[in-house]
Amino acid sequence: MIRTVSSGIFVCGLSILAGCAGMQETNKINGTRYLETETGRWLVHDMNRPAPPVITPGTQSTQKQAGKAPSDAIVLFDGTDLSEWTTIKGGPAKWTVRDGYMRVVKKTGDIKTKQSFGSCQLHIEFATPSRVTRKSQERGNSGVFLMSTYEVQVLDSYENQTYPDGQCAALYGRAVPLVNACRKPGQWQSYDIIFHRPIFKGNKVVRKATFTVFHNGVLVQDHVVLQGGTDWIDEHTVTNYSPHEDKLPLMLQDHDNPVRYRNIWVRELKDK
């Protein structure tokens, strides 16, 4: 909608007419005429302002088939092999791959990406075992670790009672999800995660990490400021922040449960 606002414009001389007129109009109508941005100072609706790049959006997954990543994403797993992954020590990842997914192999250890990431958008899909034999934290347990450090819990939380900060979509030991959006055991589920890394100055954290998480399309972590680490120390203790590199690998956890993963991709984000 375009709305016309009538206001007087003081003429200050030809050389500064535009700037002065803009200043008076801003003051008169209590509005904004110029915007200070990362790419410079721009007039509102300025056609010379840089346009965003054009990409091809991805496609949605179904229970039977994984979707496709957007064209500007870094694909970490497309269902064919583990060429983008290693063990924690850097050896070949030993999880199995079949029918378009990877599956945790008990006692083979966590796996990590060969590439390192900081702030990012992450899409990942998972399925806990369809056959339920355990309860609480022993039921479909795994984890998605941003920067190999900050965990979004993976767990079968469908009709499965456990401590709230350890259920599915929790920031482990730190933040309880807004709702329990779990599907039934064996069904494919998704996380869409917006993560901004912590920033350190020496041994001090000067900006804490933030998480926004959608679980099966439902907002469950709303720009949560992570108050510290998520590594388990004992029953009632998790770690504090510890300085680390600006970029680190993504890690998936082997918690002795045959959890499956598919359609994993990431888009790197600029630090603000």
Features from the language model and the residues they span:
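Bacterial N-terminal signal peptides that target proteins for export
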Residues: 1-12
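Carbohydrate-interacting regions of secretory-pathway proteins
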Residues: 20-272
